[in-house]
Amino acid sequence: MRLRHGRGTVALALAVVAGTGTIGITGLTGLTGPTGTAGNPAPAPLTRTLPRTAPPAQATPLTSPPPSPARTTPRSPATRTAPPAVWPRPHALRPTGAPATVTAEVALRTGPAADPYAVQALRTLLRQAGARRITGSAGPVPPGALVVRAGTGPADGDLPSGGYRLTVDGGTVTLSGAGPDGLFHAVQTLRQLVRPDGTIAGAVVRDWPGTAVRGTTEGFYGAPWTREQRLALLDFMGRTKQNHYLYAPGADRYRQARWREPYPAGQRAHFRELAERARRNHVTLGWAVAPGQAMCLSSDADVRALIRKTEAMRALGFGAFQLQFQDVSYSEWHCEADAERFGSGPRAAARAHARVANAVARYLADRHPGGPALTLMPTEYYQDGATAYRRELAGALDAGVQVAWTGVGVVPRTITGRELATAREVFRHPLVTMDNYPVNDYAQDRVFLGPYTGREPAVAAGSAALLANAMAQAEASRIPLFTAADFAWNPRFYRPQESWRAALDDLAAGDGRRAEALAALAGNDASSVLGGPESAYLRPLLETFWRTRGSAGERSAGLRAAFTVMRETPARLSGTPLALEVEPWTRQLARYGEAGLAALDMLRAQHTGDPAAAWTAYRTLGALRERLGAARVTVGDGVLDPFLTRALRAYETWAGLGAGPGADRGGAGDGRTVRFPRPRALATVTVLAEPGTRGTVEADVPGEGWRRLGALDASGATELPARLRAAAVRVTGPSPARVRHLVPWFADAPAAALEVPGTVDAEIGGTGRLTARLSALRPADVRGRLTVRAPRGVEVRVTGGVLTLPRGSSVRVPVAVTVPEGTPARSYAVRLAFGAVSRTLTVRAVPPTAGPDLARTGTARSSADETPDFPAAAANDGDPRTRWSSPVRDGAWWQVRLARPVRLGRVVLRWQDAYASAYRVQVSADGRRWRTAAVVRDGRGGREELRTDERDVAYVRVQGERRATPYGYSLWSVEAYAVAD
């Protein structure tokens, strides 16, 4: 990653010849000219403008390399009338329901202007679709044969270069393309409309690129891609309608310190091979040179040497060039002449960079007119706003030079149209957006396989080029690069998740088991700086499992299947280029899958009361956790490890290894004895040892001495009833190391734990709701009733009847607290009990609120706003899409002045992801003297409602005390409601 870093139209027509008569070649009618947008002109829609919330298209498998229709999965009769999904997503596609058929013999008729690479791709497609013989232009057309006619036609003035039209209706197929690559793009779409039975789905397509230049950068630090990887990538780029590849490996010294020297012969041959493959795929090769560390910028000789190098690279097949100065100093020159000519500082550096760029750009324009513009990567390529360097560069740089930037930040979470417009105003030149996603050289423990997100459509439309910087893992990069290509082609209707699923299908090449493995790998490596939830497909399975665990309706089958796919991922991907690239991550994923299955086995054994199986799975899981912790790659961050940790804790609670009255006290002396502070009533003794350990469990009975309780079980998990008073327990026989845990369970300890919130608010005349949590503390199921004792004026309802608490588990019991009308507004103590354990719940009876949101008409202020994009007023403007954000400061605050003083009864906060873990709600009558109305010490974010009863409130303030994230505070909205009259 670069850290610190109207043309002619070719028409192609296909017609089915029936007998001696030919069905006429048809075209599209009623199409209007372009409406025009920033960047590329946008042709008018075929039928209507699609709504922004258009229903998602159903993704269908794409393959890599291009699929042979005979190898793809047959479509069901129900789906045969619908066209397959096309990627990148077309701007306008309408099914016609009338397919065409590829016959065994096809007559190909081409004109002199037909793009030879498009025709070659078409020939390949027809053969894959079932054509056994393709005849040339001469000779009669055989009866019943499919006729392919390619010739010059009228210019499609309403389509930008790269646009195309395609119609399949009633046995006639017509394709036309604008510019040198439009016909090629039409063939790529036609490829995806061909069905396994040799028919072509009926459809009308009118499509064009939303970004003129779209592509991929090989710009990471580390081992560059291989010859095979680059060639395969160019084929992938052709299929996904990308048209620019920028060669900029961080490890290539011949474009950096040794830029003056020619490449070795082998590398030059490789570049020529790349150039030929790029031409076949309509991809322009770009070469980036970074001479700043080894160039005298004031030297005419050095500038001429740089021009000679670019000309040499052009002879090898590179058609576009980028000059990079992102890693240079403002105070250090590489020759004394530079200091004498330019001086020092940012403005001097800008003048020097502009001088070199202008010289190269003028040479290219004079020698190769009509070619791509030179791009300059400036030293300040990621900063925000105007600086001395940027202002000087804008004035000194020739108008024809484009400027590269990465957005605001080296790897920005988002890039907005406003940021692009601001940068363009500052540089006063066309901008090339060099997006540093999915590149991972700054986080080498990760592969970023999530979809391209966080970029507004205006970024694609307003950029002279949009290039995504790939990872060192070329095959794996195809997943996010596929989605980036989809965005760049049609940014307005880009759907990240649908595009991402199509990318997985593309890389799976029609193999269902491989597709499942790819989905598991990518699903557990989807998060990045751009955001996105990790392991999103697993989260609902995990939540469902924990919610139903231990019940008759336990649902673990889906989770078990997911873990099985994870475990099998290395085997399912074996033999593919991808497997070698991502082996560290697939191996780690397989370990997580194996660990997940062990966790499910362990929890299942607990549920069925099988101590031996549970102990075996626990030991297996522990060993796998050690191997997982030793790995140097990250997979399923924040999801997989927490699940395993929770499962281990569930077993430890079940086995009595956690804290509490029955906790394992670790042993004393030789490690096989646990002594009690005083004699206790024993119920059960649990011993967990290495399988095959021999020994005897004994209890020290006061006045009697050691009494034998029983022998150790060969499985290693032993549970023996005691039912006596003892001062100690021990295991005799084995060495201390073979006994892992010795756990006494006491009969005189509480059978269960009861947890309730300390306080609940209940509106007078209404009902407050909470949940009581009961946890079993015995080596068996616990049964009992949850009872309530409430004062007069408070009604409490709990689930009736006898409750069963499974061993080692918790049960949540809904509790409803009702405060009848007329009850005084104050606090009431309610006693809840389960067996011998009880807890006190404080019920705060609060007055009801009514009326509109008072904050909506108030005037907002804050201690400070993060940026002008997130002002204080955004938190009470009624718009759910806007928010206030503070700088990174614990003590930041937001407040609103109400339109009139009120008796305040309720405040509702809706936090963005950056929330407060501790804060206060303060009120004031004059905005100077404040009093605390509510205190929150364990904020959870999301929607938080606070009840109060404060009089004469004219100001409401949310005073932050402790941030829950590395960011500041961010509120979508703040609402305030008055007490009802």
Which stretches of residues belong to each language-model region?
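Catalytic-core regions of glycoside hydrolase
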Residues: 179, 195, 220, 257, ...
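Short, surface-exposed loop/turn segments at beta-strand-coil junctions that are enriched for proline
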Residues: 818-824
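C-terminal functional modules
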Residues: 495-663
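Secretory targeting and sorting signals
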Residues: 1-73
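Feature activates predominantly on carbohydrate-active enzymes
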Residues: 159-309, 315-319, 326
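Acidic, contiguous N-terminal accessory segments
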Residues: 2-15, 19, 71-170, 197-205
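Short beta-strand-plus-loop segments that form exposed binding edges in beta-rich domains
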Residues: 731-736, 959-966
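Disordered, acidic Ser/Thr/Pro-rich linker "stalks" and the adjacent N-terminal cap
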Residues: 620, 624-632, 636-695, 699-705, ...
